[in-house]
């Protein structure tokens, strides 16, 4: 199974575990006890290979991480947990960080023109080009 969970600054173990269950089962989860929730996750992941994406993680509390990850250890070898974060400390805490570099300004400009103007030719909109270039500069 593949699961994507938006974490943000609310690293609530119960909520995240519920989100995983709802993604795995495609059903609303009305359970609230963390132990019960984790049994359900374990049952759904045991002997299965999975990909779990935890997007925009901010929490640096290693005890919460350990509690959250407990039922995830039952997946098959090859299962992966991908964590996106802006925090170097979190990246190092959860495993093997891969720092991503930004896209160069020329590539941003090319993409922006295609999205904003419908093509890579901004020539039809010279009055907007200066504003668009300022926006692109901020995207980095």
Predicted regions and their residues:
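Post-nucleotide-binding-loop coupling segment downstream of the phosphate-binding loop, primarily
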Residues: 1-40, 58-59, 101
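Tandem alpha-helical RNA-recognition repeat domains
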Residues: 8-9, 73, 137
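Generic detector of short alpha-helix boundary/capping microenvironments
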Residues: 14, 69-72, 120-124
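Non-catalytic, charged helical/coil tracts that couple and regulate nucleotide-powered enzyme cores
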Residues: 20-22, 26-32, 77-80, 87-140
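A conserved switch/coupling segment of P-loop NTPase cores
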Residues: 35-103
């Amino acid at each position: 199974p593949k699961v994507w969970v938006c974490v943000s600054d609310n690293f609530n173990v119960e909520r995240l575990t519920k989100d995983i269950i709802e993604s795995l089962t495609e059903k609303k989860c009305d359970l609230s006890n963390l132990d019960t929730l984790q049994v359900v996750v374990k049952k759904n992941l045991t002997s299965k290979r999975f990909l779990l994406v935890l997007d925009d993680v901010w929490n640096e509390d290693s005890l919460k991480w350990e509690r959250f990850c407990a039922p995830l250890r039952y997946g098959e070898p090859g299962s992966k947990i991908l964590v996106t974060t802006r925090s170097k400390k979190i990246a190092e805490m959860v495993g093997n960080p891969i720092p991503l570099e930004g896209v160069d300004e020329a590539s941003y400009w090319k993409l922006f023109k295609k999205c904003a103007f419908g093509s890579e030719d901004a020539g039809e909109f010279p009055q907007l080009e200066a504003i668009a270039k300022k926006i692109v500069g901020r995207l980095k």
